[in-house]
Design a protein with these regions (language model features):
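Phosphate-binding P-loop
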Residues: 6-13
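Hydrophobic anchor at the beta1->P-loop junction of P-loop NTPases
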Residues: 18
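The conserved Walker
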Residues: 22
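Conserved lysine of the Walker
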Residues: 26
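Hydrophobic positions on the alpha1 helix immediately C-terminal to the Walker A/P-loop
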Residues: 29, 33
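N-terminal phosphate/diphosphate-binding loop that engages ATP/GTP or pyrophosphate donors
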Residues: 36-90, 97
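Switch II (G3) loop of P-loop NTPases
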Residues: 82-87, 106-122
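Conserved catalytic-core segment of NTP-binding enzymes
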Residues: 117-228
Length: 255
């Protein structure tokens, strides 16, 4: 997968956790970021880092990162999630490897966190393992999801997540979309809300999520300078959605 809107020097903190309500797209973003970083690191001859993706989305067992386990392994991403009979469990199960990975200096850890305050408590249980000074806690925002349509409602959800996890948000990810029906207006309105939410929380907009079709349109018509406003954007290919919902297979050639 080409990433035309992501600078070549784009990188992640030692630990990056993505939080937000169900349907915001955090699992897709977590998976894509992990694969992207693994690919970029593997291209460096002096690289000593590895990438791990921790799936602690313990609530709704839909579109979770663990569903792409075999493909992630082939792409050099270490998946940390319950396996075997517990793979589909809708239970607050955290693997011991998560705590170990959080302490490893040679590991970039990406965390896919549950979609509401109850799920954020799972992240809170790792608080003593993670260097909070090197943790990015990013709120993924899709304006078209319930309770995400106004600054006040988003900030209320954000405050609940912060209290539940015992951690402070460090940024916002704008990922407003309508799947295949996403328009340029959706991207613009989503970014506008994300900026206002960021202002209310005193954190920056760190990233924009774009579906493949809308990203192609933006690149073709050279709309990035005006639409994305200098904010890095990551192209998402719906690797976690089943084919009947427009998903695609994750392969070692992507992203």
């Amino acid at each position: 997968m080409q990433q035309p809107f992501l600078p070549a020097d784009f990188t992640l903190a030692s630990s990056t956790a993505l939080v937000g309500p169900y349907g915001s797209g955090k699992s897709e973003i977590a998976l894509t970021l992990a694969c992207l970083m693994a690919r970029r690191l593997q291209a460096r001859p002096d690289n000593r880092l590895q990438v791990a993706l921790g799936d602690i989305d313990v609530l709704k067992p839909y579109f979770r990162a663990r569903e792409a386990g075999e493909a992630l392994k082939a792409m050099g991403v270490r998946l940390l999630a319950p396996g075997g009979s517990l793979k589909s469990a809708d239970l607050p199960i955290l693997t011991p490897e998560l705590g170990c990975a959080a302490r490893e200096a040679d590991t970039l850890l990406v965390l896919d966190v549950g979609g509401d305050p109850a799920g954020a408590r799972a992240l809170g249980s790792l608080r003593d393992e993670v260097d909070t000074n090197a943790l990015d806690l990013l709120l993924v925002l899709n304006r078209h999801r319930p309770f995400m349509e106004s600054v006040e409602s988003v900030v209320e959800q954000a405050d609940k997540i912060q209290r539940a996890s015992g951690l402070r948000l460090t940024g916002v990810v704008s990922n407003t979309h309508m799947m295949a029906e996403t328009t340029l207006d959706d991207v613009a309105l989503g970014l506008e809300l994300a900026r206002r939410v960021g202002g209310a929380l005193d954190v920056p907009v760190r990233l924009i999520g774009l579906g493949r079709a809308i990203a192609t349109l933006i690149e073709r018509d050279d709309l990035a300078p005006s639409l994305l406003q200098g904010i890095p954007a990551i192209v998402l290919d719906s690797a976690l959605k089943p084919a009947f919902l427009g998903g695609c297979a994750l392969s070692p050639g992507a992203p």
